[in-house]
Each structure stands twice: as C-alpha cells, then as structure tokens.
Curated annotation (Swiss-Prot):
Function: Core component of nucleosome. Nucleosomes wrap and compact DNA into chromatin, limiting DNA accessibility to the cellular machineries which require DNA as a template. Histones thereby play a central role in transcription regulation, DNA repair, DNA replication and chromosomal stability. DNA accessibility is regulated via a complex set of post-translational modifications of histones, also called histone code, and nucleosome remodeling.
The protein's name in its UniProt record: Histone H4
GO annotation, cellular component aspect: nucleosome; nucleus
Alphabetically ordered keywords of this record: Acetylation, Chromosome, DNA-binding, Methylation, Nucleosome core, Nucleus
Family under the similarity heading: Belongs to the histone H4 family.
One GO molecular-function entry: protein heterodimerization activity
Lineage: Eukaryota, Metazoa, Ecdysozoa, Arthropoda, Hexapoda
Length: 103
C-alpha cells in the first residue's frame, strides 16, 4: 500500500472504460428458489410453474418505477449519487413507506 486510502490509483479520477460489460437479462438473477422463498414468506403452499417468469416481469416493472423516481429526486438535488433517502422517498411516493433507513 502506498498510503492513498481505499480510493484507487491516485492521479485524477481515471479515464473512460474501454470495455464495459453489457448488462443483459439481469432479471434472471432472481432465481426460482428466491421467488419460492418470497412466496413461502407470503404463506403460499404450492406454486405454478408459470409464476416464475410472471414474477420476474412484475418485479422488473416495480423496480423500474422505484429507480426512475429515485433518480428524479437525485437529479433535482443536483447530485450524481443516488442515496438511500432517495429510494425511501421514491417508495413513499408510491405508497410503500419503508422504515429504518433514515429520515
């Protein structure tokens, strides 16, 4: 270690990334067992095979709406970093109040 802390290479903020990983089908990262665990927590006993893709679609739309609102709050505050409070306010705006993250 050269004493620069956790931050990186020093000398400016770094250049543009030459090769950026293309994010595609991340919704498939929500696995079948994860959806099954959520359903079990909600009291579901048996799950149809068609539920998994439908659940992924619903979750994708839900998170797109939350992220869009959170980014709107961030841009309004003239910041580039989305904070936990931006997400809390976005959820509150949609009628899903979340406690435990400040505010």
């Amino acid at each position: 270690m050269t004493g620069r802390g956790k931050g990186g290479k020093g000398l400016g903020k770094g250049g543009a990334k030459r090769h950026r990983k293309v994010l595609r089908d991340n919704i498939q990262g929500i696995t079948k067992p994860a959806i099954r665990r959520l359903a079990r927590r909600g009291g579901v006993k048996r799950i149809s095979g068609l539920i998994y893709e439908e659940t992924r679609g619903v979750l994708k739309v839900f998170w797109q709406n939350v992220i869009r609102d959170a980014v709107t709050y961030t841009e309004h505050a003239k910041r580039k970093t989305v904070t936990a409070m931006d997400v809390v306010y976005a959820l509150k705006r949609q009628g899903r109040t979340l406690y435990g993250f400040g505010g």
